[in-house]
Amino acid sequence: MNLNSIPAFDDNYIWVLNDEAGRCLIVDPGDAEPVLNAIAANNWQPEAIFLTHHHHDHVGGVKELVKKFPQIVVYGPQETQDKGTTRVVKDGEIAFVLGHEFSVIATPGHTLGHICYFSKPYLFCGDTLFSGGCGRLFEGTPSQMYQSLKKLSALPDDTLVCCAHEYTLSNMKFALSILPHDLSINDYYRKVKELRAKNQITLPVILKNERQINVFLRTEDIDLINVINEETLLQQPEERFAWLRSKKDRF
């Protein structure tokens, strides 16, 4: 399987997995045009689309792609049923695509119906987990997002985290504002800054590394707890997550 990223809009990535025969899976096609161009350039045969949630920058290209390739099966959560989804999937179900099993993981928070797809090593996590950050809480609660991130963080170390946006640099600036002396965060920030200066993608990331540099995955880390305790005493990791998310919203 080959993993490809297609830039869209200002900072979106549309992920495509293709096999040796050229069959492909498209994830969150917010815009059809760059996908159609990539399909033509690579001679791919689209078989399926995965949708993670209902926001327009993730679903906007579905209908045009299905019109061009009517054989495509569109998988998505209930909230995408009016966005072109033909096969609604929910937590714990399996999507069989390109000869692989993709587990569906419910990750409410960014939206209430948000889901992710995992087939080792690939995790397509939409707007739930970003490198160095997590999605805004447009519909869900901090507790829901905390539990969703906990699920994703428990996946195997070598998981390739395929996020839907290039937010890494701004996320790492926030991480540095919280833990300015953390060596892992400083090292990763420098690496990301260099990549973005060359207009290069920072994704996908390896989950084992992400756990070290993403403050939203470190709510039980003593260094982070000490920082938060300087401002307020919070006993539960869910509360510390909510504190971080609130800080990030105002950053």
Curated annotation (Swiss-Prot):
Keyword Hydrolase: yes
EC number per UniProt: 3.1.2.6
Alphabetically ordered keywords of this record: Hydrolase, Metal-binding, Zinc
Catalyzed reactions per annotation: an S-(2-hydroxyacyl)glutathione + H2O = a 2-hydroxy carboxylate + glutathione + H(+)
GO process annotations (BP): methylglyoxal catabolic process to D-lactate via S-lactoyl-glutathione
Residues annotated for Zn(2+) 2 binding in this entry: 57-58, 127, 165
Database matches in InterPro entries: Clx_II_MBL, Glyoxalase_II_hydrolase, HAGH_C, Hydroxyacylglutathione_Hdrlase, Metallo-B-lactamas, RibonucZ/Hydroxyglut_hydro
Pathway: Secondary metabolite metabolism; methylglyoxal degradation; (R)-lactate from methylglyoxal: step 2/2
CC cofactor note: Binds 2 Zn(2+) ions per subunit.
Binding of Zn(2+) 1, residues: 53, 55, 110, 127
Keyword DNA damage included in the entry's annotation: no
Top-level taxon of origin: Bacteria
Gene3D superfamilies recorded: Ribonuclease Z/Hydroxyacylglutathione hydrolase-like
Enzyme class: hydrolase
Pfam families: HAGH_C (PF16123), Lactamase_B (PF00753)
Cofactor: Zn(2+)
Molecular-function annotations in GO: hydroxyacylglutathione hydrolase activity; metal ion binding
Subunit: Monomer.
Function: Thiolesterase that catalyzes the hydrolysis of S-D-lactoyl-glutathione to form glutathione and D-lactic acid.
UniProt family annotation: Belongs to the metallo-beta-lactamase superfamily. Glyoxalase II family.
NCBIfam families: GSH_gloB, PRK10241.1
Protein's name in the database: Hydroxyacylglutathione hydrolase
Species whose genome carries this gene: Escherichia coli O17:K52:H18 (strain UMN026 / ExPEC)
